[in-house]
Every structure is written in C-alpha cells, then in structure tokens.
C-alpha cells in the first residue's frame, strides 16, 4: 500500500505519556495506536516497537524517545513516550519533545508514586498546562471505593502543582485489556477527553513577532541589515519593532525591507530565514544576541530562576560538581552571557546528572520570558540545559 502524504487538514497537537515507571505509559501508547488504527487513524505500534526507543542527541544530551503519530476525527497528534525516568527529565527540561498537553498514566492498583509527583512538577514548570489522567490497570482493583480514593489522590496532587485538579478528566480502564481483548472503550473515552480538554496550541504565526539576531551587516546606501530565523509571528515591511537585550535600554526601528533567498518580500513568517533592513539604525547599535520583537511583547532581564539538568560526564559534561557562585556562560538563542548561580538553601553542590532549581544573575540583560530554553556552557562545551521557570527582575 502506498504511503499517504501528510495532510494538514486537521489541527496538530503534540502530546506525551507521563507517569511513574511500570504504571503502563508505553502500553497505553500502544493501545491508543491499536484502537485508532481500527478507524484508519494510526499505524499499529506494538509495545516492543515503542519500548526500544532510539537514542537521540539533543544539544549533546542523549535522550531515548519514541515518537508515534495518530489521528482522531478532529485532530492529528504527535505523541512522545520515553522508556526511562531520566529521559523524561531531560526531555522536558531541554524541550527536545514539545508537549502541548500530557496523558498522566497512574496505576489504579498502586496510586500516585514518587515519579508521578515529579512528572507533574516538571510539567508545571515547563509550560505543559493541561493534563488528562488515565487510571490504568483498573481490572486489578475489585473495590470501587479504592478507585475513587486513587482518583481523589491524583486530583489533589494535580491541584497542589497548579493544575485544575477538580476539572481535569479522569478516565478509568486497562490498556492491556484493550490490546489483548479488544476491550477498547476506555481508550476511545481517553482520546475523546484529550480531544476536548487539551486545547489546540496557538500557531507560531499567530504569536507576537520575534526574531533572534544572528548577524548584522551594512549595505552601502541602504543601511543596516539584521539576519536571523523568525522564531514566531509575522513581519511586514513598514512594521515598527523593538531591539531588545544585551543593553538596559530598548531600541526602536522600522522595517524598510525584508529579504529572503536574495528576493525582496512584503512579509516574513515563523520559520523563515531572513534579512531585515532597519531604518536609522547604525551598525554598532545592534548585535548578535539581541532580538527584534513586536513592541511591548518581550523585555530584557538579568535575574531569573531556572530548572536545569546538569550533563553527566558520559554526555560530555563536567567530571566534578559545582558549588554556589559558579560562573559559567548561559547560551540564550544566539549568544553566550556570563552569569552567576545561587543554589537553593540546603544544597551544597550540584553533581553531574542532577536536575535542580537555581537562581541566576546575568552580567548583561537578555530578552527573556517564561519557558525560554537555555544551555549552560563552559569553554564552549555544554555542561547543562535549562528552562526559565520565573523571572525575578
């Protein structure tokens, strides 16, 4: 049978399975593909196919992830499943696999466990705002009161980390039964809940314009050009933009031309690599590391709290721990900025392989917002990967 080409006729959503080890994340993923395959919305993926996740290198960090795609009547999904707990931690902090929402798999027989809590916390930190709960292995629980108790526990846990524990859908069932006995109503219910509860993300082109500046040069007689890849939004000739970062004050200019592949355009959009001609800006007034942005959409900051994964020695990271006051480079978008680290109270040092919250103060401000990813580098090599969880000032 010929492969159908990817039709973009449905909204696209990225999701993933999260939860404690052995609660059935991968089995649930397999059950979803089998159930949706009956309606022609997926190719069947067995547990083994998903479980032998290929190793991927994301910014030098080794992560095992399985990517599965499927569709319901309403949407097209890309679904990520990780075999190991460490893979989840790395995945969520580095943003290797973006998630618009998540399916939290909890064994009804065991209830919430330590990694259940940790994954919920991570999801809340990295901007996954919607979680649908699947209480798996319900066939192993004879007492309906016990099921209610577990559901209550999970809802309380979600509320504790800022999710809407009262409103989020909880679907009860057995992924294994769905696979082995074709008893897949619970999976249909689960996907209906995902369809209805996890909102379609705002497309990158609908967000306010932002382009990190990669290079700057002068065209004689025309002015200064900043080049880079448009991260989000749309830019039109004649738009006013701000120049943000690397300095305390915010610059302002008007776009007098947009060029792509040596052709002049009227507009550029998210994903385009462009050169933007800036009115009245001198060559030395703009530099790599700044961003061009829609006025008022992003501001420069020096102090923030970040959730960071510290690379292990085997991943090319440090061989030794670091301590309070450590001063590496923080790589945001297109440039390195030196910053100093303050560790949480009671934490003496950070070992390679740890993940931790840290307070950072940069020596120059960077255009920054929550959920912005960064790398920590030392002498040009990456030693950590992080995400901004809150801006201090």
Swiss-Prot record:
Region (G3): 81-84
Keyword RNA-binding included in the entry's annotation: no
Region annotation (G2) ranges: 60-64
Disulphide bonds in the chain: none
UniProt subcellular location: Cytoplasm
PROSITE patterns: G_TR_1, G_TR_2
Binding-site positions, GTP: 19-26, 81-85, 136-139
Alphabetized GO MF terms: GTP binding; GTPase activity; translation elongation factor activity
NCBIfam families with a match to the protein in the record: EF-Tu (TIGR00485), PRK00049.1 (NF000766), PRK12735.1 (NF009372), PRK12736.1 (NF009373), small_GTP (TIGR00231)
Protein name: Elongation factor Tu
Annotated gene: tuf1
